[in-house]
Amino acid sequence: MPEKKRCQMERKENKARFCALSEVLADWKWLLTYSRRCKKMIALYIALGVLGTTVGLFGSVAGKYLIDIVTGYDTARLPLLVFAAIGSTAVSIAFDCVVSRVLKKLEIDLNNNVRADVFDRILDADWQALHAFSCGDILNRFETDTGAVGGGAVSWLPQILVTAYRLCAVFFLIWIYSPVMALIALGGAPVVLLLSAAVLKKRRAFENKLRRLGSEMTAFEAETFYTIDTVKSLGTMQSQSRKLKEKQEALRACSLQYNMFSVRVNALLRVAGAFTQFTAMGYGLYLLWTRAITFGTLTLFLQQRSSLTSAFESAAGLIPKFLSTAISAHRVRELCELPKERHGKTALPQGALMVELKNVTAAYRNGEAVLKNVSFAAGPGEIAVLVGTSGAGKTTLVRVLLGLVYPESGRAVLRGKNGCEIVISAETRCAFSYVPQGSTLFSGTIAENLRMAKENATEEEMTAALKTACAWAFVSSLPNGVNTKIAEHGGGLSEGQAQRIAIARAVLRGAPILLLDEATSALDEKTEAQVLKNLLTALPDTACILTTHRPGALKYCTRLYKAENGALTCIEVNKPA
């Protein structure tokens, strides 16, 4: 290979290694912001760890002198040394108990803090940015990676400081008795440091791949369970099972590759440790043979050499944990650093509102415009109906109204009675009572589902809302009425019943704009007609927007819009009855 090309490749590798290290450090800088929230407890944890190490060393020195007494070298201080040995053991046990308690409290508090923060960030994330992640991937990061972040924030700094103190204390204790033995015991350190630095990039690549494969498998499992009815009805159980096994095999292969890599690295570290151990033992036996040290001192040397090696192994073990936690922190950071929703700063006017879109063009990220220069309006007491084929832009228009998708051009506003305009954003979402396609009920009682719209709703208010949605007849016939429990997605109810409860929940919310996205699709024509009549009667000052494929709703509309190829045409405008 030409010298110039080889130098270019080396520079490229060094640059990649530097970038990887910079990213890891940035992830840890973000993670340690959580450590600052519990800095007093972490300081206590560190202090207890240092004191526990000191007590352990004190006990080792006491043991050295006890051995010398037994072997006849020193008999004058037997009572004191027995007391010191017993006392150090008792104190060590007490420290272990306190440290365990402090650590558990720290872990719980920080894990809860991290999970709560990530949960809130996800809820406030921009809708389009969030949809770059599958639900399974988000769940995997939320369940697995947040725990690693919390654990790292709790234990990383204390482990570094306590391990560093332990290394220094043991080294200087050995140095007091024999500087040569101390240097021999320290001999494995360069191997540990050099080897750990050399494998940094490869460890990070393995960790990244394992997390990605784990997220893919969780996403596949979540999607399968969510669509279990479809899987069963299509008879694709064996196909799904086969796909899961393929993903498991990919994860297994990667895990075994990483394991083999770790085995080789650990074997090299063990060889270096064994060489140091035999060298130290040989030198110690030589000193004992020449009567330069006592048998108790040799025991102390071997014990502390083992302790020093253990401390180095702990330090070496921190490096894979450092990388693994950094990967988790990076994955959580990706969720926390998603762009936030746009929040308006103007308070909504009281009373009825009119919604208006003027020459709006909207598109999804990295895609063509779905809405092209459309205009739309719906005022108090009106029912504006959107019709059109699938993919024509109806759902996108609904998302614009809800502040989930932002216009690239044009204006989307709410107008109050006094003529003031407010730009639609996440902040204006409270002006809408929204009933989306499909079942949107949660597990719990019917009353709990209704009170999601209004927490302090009375029995009378819930009954009135259910009557408006033509749901009171079947709800009142249930054994426990509104206190009847239902499963997730409305399990235990028919699709039409679930839709009517969702409409009742929207009515109970009392927002000035009611937005129904195919929300009557599961109702028969007679029930659909009655629901629309009830809405006009019960909500005279509410603007109602309805997307539908069915002709039955058209006779109740005051504005009819047809969506086609991204355009929106107002077909007819009738005055409210």
Predicted regions: what they are:
Residues A116, E334, R411-V413, A447-E488, ...:
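ABC ATPase nucleotide-binding domain helical subdomain, centered on the C-loop/LSGGQ "ABC signature"
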Residues L32, R37-K40, W127-Q128, T144-A153, ...:
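An intracellular "coupling" helix at the cytosolic face of ABC transporter transmembrane type-1 domains
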Residues T396, G438, N449, T468-A469, ...:
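ABC-family ATPase nucleotide-binding domain "signature/switch" substructure
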Residues A84-D96, A189-L193, A197, S262-F278, ...:
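Hydrophobic alpha-helical segments in the permease module
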Residues S233-T236, M260, S307-L335:
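Cytosolic ends of transmembrane helices, especially the final helix of ABC transmembrane type-1 domains
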Residues L402:
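Helix-to-loop junction immediately C-terminal to a conserved catalytic motif
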Residues R37, M41-T54, A84-S88, S92, ...:
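Transmembrane helices of ABC transporter permease
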Residues M1-V55, T71-A84, V99-L103, E107, ...:
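Membrane-integrated ABC transporters
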